[in-house]
Amino acid sequence: MVFASLSACGQEPDKRLHADGKGWRIEQAVVIDKKRPRVLLVGDSILNGYKNQVIKALEGKAYVDAWVNPYHQSEHLNDVLLPAILANGPYDVVHFNIGLHGWQEGRIKDGTFEPLTKGYVQAIRKALPKVRILWASSTPVTTKGKPAKLKLEPEINSVIVEHNRLAARVMVEMKVPVNDFYALLVDKLNLARGDRFHWTGPAYKLLGKKVTESVAHELKPHL
């Protein structure tokens, strides 16, 4: 696996939303067999928790790159940063999540969430006309504290729920299959870490299994 430091890896000024790992980065598999399909996983710090499981599960079947980034919906992301990452392909499957860095007031202007999210999907299809795309909803945001006493954080999580709803509507319109991370974990708050945004190993194992199964399904024509 090759680690690349690109401007596309970005910075996150909100210290609550740290990378939870080796930092914001793109990890690129070393491609030896050019006939083997390629996969790109896109996400925030949550991706750090499950990407290795997916990479291991698909070993020998597909090369898996991972872009761990702190971005939210924006024209700059769609027009500049995302195309720069996609140029590392070509990819046969792109599995993406974008959401935990867009809840702060002012980051995404009113009325722009859906068109920008649609533009994100369009940017992928423009760069990779034959690609299979999968979208994952954002995970729940909890209160801080011990796992046994955690609840949903009322203010931030309500924004996450609304953004998930709007994004899901875009995915229906764009005919993009959905991995509902939120639904998978919302009744398992005891698996949250207690820092509001991140999760424990068992939760990431559930996410990794879900991603592996869905990506493997989309790869069937290539295997």
What is each stretch, according to the model?
Residues 42-43, 94:
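Active-site beta-strand/loop signature of hydrolases that rely on acidic residues for catalysis
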Residues 48, 74-75, 205:
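Loop/helix-junction capping segments adjacent to catalytic residues or to phosphate/diphosphate-binding pockets
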Residues 1-40, 47-48, 52-63, 87-89, ...:
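N-terminal secretory targeting modules
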Residues 44-45, 100:
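Active-site metal-binding loops of divalent metal-dependent hydrolases
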